[in-house]
Amino acid sequence: FQDRMGWNLYYAWYMYCVVAWFVVDGKWVEGLPLRTGEKLRYKINALKTGAIALGFAMTIIFIKGPASFTLLYDHFPGLLSAALVNSILQAIYVYAASFHGKKLLALGGNSGNPIFDWFIGRELNPRIGEFDIKTFNELRPGLILWALLDISCVCHQYTKFGWVSDSIVLVTLFHIWYIVDSLINESTILTQMDITTDGFGFMLSVGDLAWLPFTYCLQARFLAFHPIHLGWLGVLAILAVQFTGYYIFRVANLEKNEFRHGRNPKGTY
């Protein structure tokens, strides 16, 4: 909590994501019908937001060298603390806001127990105008930050040892692959349970903003100070597992998305 630089970095990052949502061009799509029959509109520009951020990071590394981008690695505790506080404050805000006006409440977060409802999420789609807080946090601040944290870990390893291990390269590339895939398929999250059924409370807030980026990057963080050399056989074996797993993951998710949209006539309950 005393790492002022870490806090400043995190909130500067979060504000970038918010500003990018408003100013970066993106198409608008409709979500699934709500219980009321209404369909909400969502702005799809997470991929462009991520591309700008990653492009900026790579430009810094190219111009100033890897040592210039170890800042995220060095200020990891401060970044994590700021993310936790941000997630708690957002959970408090959306819970309080759910009592004002006619809000559509989540069936599972309207128990009457304030602690439970705050944790699970009372309002289904908390918004400020057309800015949807839940879908925004789902893909942007945490997911893209995960990629930046991984890259910072690679830079730390290179700065400390003068070389980069094959293991950390694979971990980082696979993580970024998953992240970019998620950003490309941003509209598919609109059919997922997190968006259609769950309210937005502390559970999703801390999961999206703190748990996801700061635990998912731990493999790269460990390898940053403990390099492991796999060799060509190890690399090829891991690549085979990765490609197989990704194929299953993507095909299964696309099939689920098509079924939820009613576009898969072969699908059955």
Question: What does each model-found stretch correspond to?
Answer:
Residues F1-Y269:
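Membrane-anchoring alpha-helices and their flanking helix-loop junctions
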